Amino acid sequence: MKRVKVIQIKGFFRVMALLAPLLLNAYLPVQASEEHAAPVAAVVAAHAEAAVDPALEPAHAEPAGHEDEKAGDVIMHHILNSHSFSFEPFGTIHLPTLPPVFGIDISITKHVVMLWIVSAILLVLFSFVGAAYRKITPKTAPSGVANTMEALVEFIRLDVAKSNIGHGYEAHLPYLLTVFMFILLCNILGLIPYGATATGNINVTLTLAVFTFFITQAASLKAHGLKGYLTHLTAGTHWSLWIIMIPIEVIGLFTKPFALTVRLFANMTAGHIVILSLIFISFILKSYVVAAAVSVPFSIFIYLLEIFVAFLQAFIFTMLSALFIGLATAHEGGEAEAAHH
């Protein structure tokens, strides 16, 4: 590998290590939906009480669909944000609560904790790989984690950044690499038992999309200047059509981050709901046959599919971010080429 290439990649890791803490604030705290997310222990206790009480009158029996409602509460408890971590059957860790600021709950939630964990992993990973690259000479090749990260960097650099942005892609590569790794780790950690999927929180995905939006607009202003940026809003049409074109172009500016927000949030949330729903089928029907024939096999299949989706959604978000930047910075005659890639 050429020395210039080594120095360039080393620089990418150093910049990413500096940029990773910026994503610590990639959230807007949400209040826990306690009324929609009953603790698992309460559900188990309710079932136990009904089972050991032989004198339970039929008039006091639970409605037919009550068990379904309890199952739904447990599912939502695992999906929604909250101020506690449940480690059944070991107990629950309650996170610190802070007084509201201007009516906004800024208390620490489980999704905030997951964001901190992901950011810490990124800092350690990028620092480790950066240190490994500093020891590499032009006659040696990276190995282990550094080799894996080099392949990832080259993939994002060539197939995502360079192919979609073109000239000047180097300035945006650190952000694209960081956001890809950040989303990927958030998705993967959400599949681990006792973990939580921060990207299943629409506030997190919205903040990431806002980052892309402002970076895109800043890149467009830098590439075209203020006059060129405003001219782009008219789409090169006659002034008589500006009253129609300008609102359409302005709406188009905000539909892009909206699409990024909803796509990532919906895909990550839906996958977890499907997995938990399949698991609870056997409990609702109280059948080991259903569990063995349907719930377990399909849950494993969906779980493996979710691992693939975790990588896919991180790639799609990064690819679309690069595409939006490329379209915003493309000059006349280059926009079609950027769209083609």
From Swiss-Prot:
Taxonomic lineage of the native organism: Bacteria, Pseudomonadati, Chlorobiota, Chlorobiia, Chlorobiales
Family listed: Belongs to the ATPase A chain family.
A Pfam family matched in the record: ATP-synt_A
Topology in membrane: Multi-pass membrane protein
Gene name of the encoded protein: atpB2
Protein name per its UniProtKB record: ATP synthase subunit a 2
Gene Ontology CC entries for this record: plasma membrane; proton-transporting ATP synthase complex
Function: Key component of the proton channel; it plays a direct role in the translocation of protons across the membrane.
SUPFAM superfamilies: F1F0 ATP synthase subunit A
Protein location: Cell inner membrane
Primary subcellular site in the record, as a coarse category: membrane
Record carries keyword Nucleotide-binding: no
CDD domains in the cross-refs: ATP-synt_Fo_a_6 (cd00310)
Keyword terms of this UniProt record: ATP synthesis, Cell inner membrane, Cell membrane, CF(0), Hydrogen ion transport, Ion transport, Membrane, Signal, Transmembrane, Transmembrane helix, Transport
